[in-house]
Amino acid sequence: MPRMTQLDLIRNFSIVAHIDHGKSTLADRLIQLTGTVAERDMKAQILDSMDIERERGITIKANTVRIDYPAKDGRTYVLNLIDTPGHVDFAYEVSRSMRAVEGSLLVVDASQGVEAQTLANVYQALDAGHEIVPVLNKIDLPAAEPERVKSQIEDVIGLDASDAVLISAKSGLGIPDVLEAIVHRLPPPKGDREAPLKAMLVDSWYDAYLGVVVMIRVMDGVIRKGDRVKMMQTGAVYGIDRLAVLKPQMVDIAELGPGEIGVLTASIKQVRDTRVGDTITHEKKGCAAPLPGFKPAQPVVFCGLFPVDANDFEALREAIEKLALNDASFTYEMETSAALGFGFRCGFLGLLHLEVVRDRLEREYDLDLITTAPSVVYQIYMKDGTLQELHNPTDMPDLTYVDHIEEPRIRATIMVPDEYLGDVLKLCQDRRGIQLDLSYAGARAMVVYDLPLNEVVFDFYDRLKSVTKGYASFDYQITGYREDFLVKMSILVNDEPVDALSMMVHRDRADMRGRAMVEKLKELIPRHMFKIPIQAAIGGRVIARETISAMRKDVTAKCYGGDATRKRKLLDKQKAGKKKMRQFGKVEIPQQAFINALKMDS
């Protein structure tokens, strides 16, 4: 069984890149070149284990691999690569992974240049005190401009890129130079073997056979199989059943020392019992203080998930419980809706997280789902001095008791080619944005806006992509709460409120949103035998109305000539019947109408 490795022979690093700049391909090449995985087991994006990660070309969970590399100086180094998610929703996972390593490879596409997510992740790496080695990928493309991109890295990020490593991850060009740069330009970890055990919990996932598998980075001390360890945030104590390193398959190891990254299993039942960023120490003679910077994951965006077929509710419950085993940041509770039946109110870290969870439920568990309009968490300050959190617009308290409402704001960084800048500024302005900064890097502009999260969760990203023909990149951080004039808009169909369509809107935009919603519903709801009013209302005040006219039979068809009062009598009789029908009639709203109304392009 392999033993511990000396500190000066370890290099821990992560790869920072924007989506599609070749991060996972580079990881594949490093693994391939060092023979870590046999050729026959090699597949593209080997560290992305979920189908959805491969398909969307994104990394959702942090993954790790230990590579043994015989360097040119004759010594064999242990390289631990943590493949981090690049997307903003998973920013906390990124920050923890960053704290677990000492250096980063900054991968930039030599034809595209620096993008918004590259920036966000580089700043996180710099915050974590990383040494950063710039790597320019795709230099074999005809459109590659390494010199322009080098100067862009220096201008935008302020890193010296003169000795950037030039590679093509696809063809394997320049990969040996990357390995040498990791060994010689990134620092070895620090740590004290004799000190009490202090290890950081970097990630955890659920395995059907082993229970919860926990990935750790040892800071000080030594951890061995059979030790009793304690999680400092939850206070739970476990006995270690198995210690291993990932190559990417598990290889058992007797002990892990300072600077090493590995995994352990300890009969832990749920991923919720392990908090990313927690500190692990020995039950007896443990370390005095936990590692700084821990914070529990807080859901930011909420939406309702309902099965299209009510009989699938139990299947949905099972699927959600299984997913939650593996995703501690995903929260759920049951909810009922008059329009959609039984379902769940779920909380997510952001829009991509919501899409990924929904896709996984539909794909892995074969469910048909309706997603209600995503909403954010509002803070409602009541007149009696109490504070309520509002996750679902239907739970909005009576406005007479409300003092004011605060909504979450974000700081959005958008990188966009110059010619689309005007459209992007207009889009942000329309979404109640406040411009904070505008700067240029070559032919690309970088705009920083303060925006309400409520305006972004709906369809901001899609609109941004369409006004910029797909060239803009977008990244955001949540900055805090601010008071604004927000109201709850209800939709009434035939004078009955439809809970699934109610939403929180800004007072100035309510009329526009209301009008668009009722016009859309008028197209979507089929005609009935009686006329149906569709209204958008704030409190008791109707702000927009459309009427779906009734289908009617020509009751006077059988009257030939003769007296007009005969026709009148038949028409009045029909009118009275329609009135009675409207009183007792139920309006059937088809599922498709809900789905389309919630996709509304505002």
From Swiss-Prot:
Pfam families: EFG_C, GTP_EFTU, GTP_EFTU_D2, LepA_C. Its EC number is 3.6.5.n1. It is an enzyme of class 3 (hydrolase). It is found in: Cell inner membrane. CDD domains: EF4_II, EF4_III, LepA, lepA_C. Its main location: membrane. One of its GO terms (cellular component) is plasma membrane. Belongs to the TRAFAC class translation factor GTPase superfamily. Classic translation factor GTPase family. LepA subfamily. This is Elongation factor 4. It comes from Cereibacter sphaeroides (strain ATCC 17023 / DSM 158 / JCM 6121 / CCUG 31486 / LMG 2827 / NBRC 12203 / NCIMB 8253 / ATH 2.4.1.). The gene is lepA.
